[in-house]
């Protein structure tokens, strides 16, 4: 059985044509991307590395990693989003190899293949996030890096990420997130400990409404990032 929720896939497929519009529904991803890209590159030094972007959607992170010199493959189960990603890659001239395949399936096919594996803003949208973490651990080379980002599960995250972002500020379409699927850092750490990955750093992401920008912080109450390495 595929580790995906058909409703979640359809939700993002319906918006696929808007993926690269920086002022539409995916504006938060465009605004967030420089922060997460810089953080990933600071750890993994992307130039010349082979990278896999799991749950790549329309390719915002995939293209930006390729732009820094990585050889990037992006995977997703939304063929609509991948179609948009392919088209944008042609328009930008930045080469990314996209494929419609599940994380678990590519892990079985290509174990220990990638220097860098990213899984950003995806874990909270799948039924079994622990299985995705395990697939990431299988895919990365010994000594390689795996990066996750997701949403904490607490009252503050619900108020800001759901009520605030979706209903008040309308930064995201209503129904983008299911609070019950948010993941506490301790839970994600548990998934990681079940593999041969170890956590190197956990950082929060804070949104500054006055400047309308995201920044790294030590506040993991809402959005947070986790950098992991596989044992050599």
Curated annotation (Swiss-Prot):
EC annotation from Swiss-Prot or TrEMBL: 2.1.1.222, 2.1.1.64
Pathway connected to this protein: Cofactor biosynthesis; ubiquinone biosynthesis
Residues annotated as binding S-adenosyl-L-methionine: 36, 55, 76, 120
Annotated catalysed reactions: a 3-demethylubiquinol + S-adenosyl-L-methionine = a ubiquinol + S-adenosyl-L-homocysteine + H(+); a 3-(all-trans-polyprenyl)benzene-1,2-diol + S-adenosyl-L-methionine = a 2-methoxy-6-(all-trans-polyprenyl)phenol + S-adenosyl-L-homocysteine + H(+)
Gene3D superfamilies for this protein: Vaccinia Virus protein VP39
Alphabetically ordered keywords of this record: Methyltransferase, S-adenosyl-L-methionine, Transferase, Ubiquinone biosynthesis
UniProt cross-references to Pfam families, sorted A to Z: Methyltransf_23
InterPro entries: SAM-dependent_MTases_sf, UbiG_MeTrfase
Protein origin, superkingdom: Bacteria
SUPFAM superfamilies referenced in this protein's UniProt entry, alphabetically: S-adenosyl-L-methionine-dependent methyltransferases
GO MF: 2-polyprenyl-6-hydroxyphenol methylase activity; 3-demethylubiquinol 3-O-methyltransferase activity; polyprenyldihydroxybenzoate methyltransferase activity
Family statement: Belongs to the methyltransferase superfamily. UbiG/COQ3 family.
Function according to Swiss-Prot or TrEMBL: O-methyltransferase that catalyzes the 2 O-methylation steps in the ubiquinone biosynthetic pathway.
Name this protein carries in UniProt: Ubiquinone biosynthesis O-methyltransferase
Organism: Burkholderia lata (strain ATCC 17760 / DSM 23089 / LMG 22485 / NCIMB 9086 / R18194 / 383)
